[in-house]
Amino acid sequence: MKCFAQIVVLLLVIAFSHGAVITGACDRDVQCGSGTCCAASAWSRNIRFCVPLGNSGEECHPASHKVPYDGKRLSSLCPCKSGLTCSKSGAKFQCS
């Protein structure tokens, strides 16, 4: 029961944080609206959500740059918004 409560709290924190705007369940990018991609959940690759494309300074995945992507996206991060590139910044990749 304690583990369940911790998971619920964690999900609530993530859902209300700036970096995890969840807009709806999906299977592929074409099911999401403009400016979003169908990203895999950080907890389970079988669960995907429509997530906004990355803004300047936000974390990104360098191999995940095509929208819409034809297959099932494996990354939990969306590509950067149009006009931005995903480049290495320190130990992470960020949209710039």
From Swiss-Prot:
User: Which InterPro entries is this protein grouped with?
Assistant: Prokineticin (IPR009523), Prokineticin_domain (IPR023569)
- Report the subcellular localization: Secreted
* Annotated Gene Ontology cellular component terms: extracellular region
Listed Pfam families: Prokineticin (PF06607)
Secretion signal span: 1-19
Question: Which GO molecular function entries does the Swiss-Prot or TrEMBL record give?
Answer: toxin activity
* UniProt main location, coarse: secreted
- Per the record's keyword annotation, is Ribonucleoprotein included, yes or no? no
Q: Which GO terms describe its biological process?
A: endothelial cell proliferation
Which keywords does the record carry? Answer: Disulfide bond, G-protein coupled receptor impairing toxin, Secreted, Signal, Toxin
Q: Disulfide bonds, which pairs?
A: C26-C38, C32-C50, C37-C78, C60-C86, C80-C95
Expression across tissues is: Expressed by the skin glands.
Q: What does this protein do?
A: Potent agonist for both PKR1/PROKR1 and PKR2/PROKR2, and inducer of a potent and long-lasting hyperalgesia. Also potentiates capsaicin-induced TRPV1 current, when tested on DRG neurons. At subnanomolar concentrations, this protein both induces potent chemotaxis of macrophages and stimulates LPS-induced production of the pro-inflammatory cytokines IL-1 and IL-12. In vivo, potently stimulates the contraction of the guinea-pig gastrointestinal (GI) smooth muscle (nanomolar concentration).
Family to which the UniProt record says this protein belongs: Belongs to the AVIT (prokineticin) family.
Record protein name field? Prokineticin Bo8
